[in-house]
């Protein structure tokens, strides 16, 4: 009721919530208000793919997984499990002659489970690069079908040390 009054009073068209796990969406959708959701989604974290969202928009965030999926240079050595995963992932990309940035953007761009995606950039040049990026076709992405990861210590940056 509070949110509906707020939306009516201030002519708010959309109300969104940032969530970390699929269960939160299930709980929040019990409300009467149509909500948009922002959640982590990328080539290795696909936990939200099968969640039905009623009405609101679906925003993917963490599509680069804090940079881990697009750069092999920033390997986190203090976390052996994460470091091992990152090395394996980038070795696979190298073997397949795929670019991590193009893979990340292609994954969310082709997904029918995502309406929008969010990215962070440090410089205008990075944004221009993203806008002008050539996407891989689905056959290239299908080569990575087995990289999905369920280990929460890898896919949730809040748990990295």
Kindly label every feature range from the protein language model.
Residues 1-160:
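Beta/alpha (TIM)-barrel catalytic core signal, keyed to glycine-rich beta->alpha loops juxtaposed to Asp/Glu
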């Amino acid at each position: 009721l509070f949110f509906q009054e707020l939306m009516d009073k201030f002519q708010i068209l959309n109300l969104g919530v940032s969530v970390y796990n699929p269960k939160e969406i299930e709980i929040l959708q019990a409300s009467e208000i149509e909500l948009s959701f922002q959640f982590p989604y990328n080539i290795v974290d696909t936990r939200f793919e099968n969640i039905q969202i009623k009405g609101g928009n679906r925003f993917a965030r963490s599509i680069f997984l804090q940079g881990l999926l697009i750069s092999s240079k920033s390997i986190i050595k203090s976390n052996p499990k994460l470091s091992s995963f990152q090395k394996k992932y980038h070795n696979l990309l190298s073997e397949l002659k795929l670019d991590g940035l193009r893979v990340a953007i292609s994954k969310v761009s082709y997904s029918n489970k995502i309406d929008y995606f969010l990215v962070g950039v440090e410089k205008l040049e990075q944004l221009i690069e993203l806008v002008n990026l050539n996407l891989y076709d689905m056959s290239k992405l299908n080569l990575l079908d087995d990289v999905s990861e369920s280990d929460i210590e890898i896919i949730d940056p809040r748990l990295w040390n």
